[in-house]
Amino acid sequence: NMVLFLLEQGARVNLKDQENRTALSLAVFKDDPNLIKTLISFGANPNKLGPNRQTPLIIASREGKYNSAKALLEGGAYPDDTDLTGRTALDWAKAKRFKRIEDLLIENGAYN
């Protein structure tokens, strides 16, 4: 696959685009845990801040991307980071009523 090829050729995995997004934060929208795990295995930082100081885990929780949230937590994402508004991933999951993500975050140490 093209992503793996680019990573193997030394692509800088934590670069941000003009909108302050990393490859990992963009991968969250695809809800592809294999892509997320690949990026992390090549050094992608699962806690790197993006737009509005949102981590990939906060984005996954806000968007209801359970598979992404799970892969990020397995890859070392911090469950209690806050965004620009002071919300955590758990706050977003609760606000959007994504119960499976709420439970996942709590199981992985999110402060409730």
Where are the regions that the model predicts?
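Eukaryotic tandem repeat interaction scaffolds
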Residues: 17-21, 25-35
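Ankyrin repeat A-helix N-terminal signature
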Residues: 26-32, 59-65, 92-98
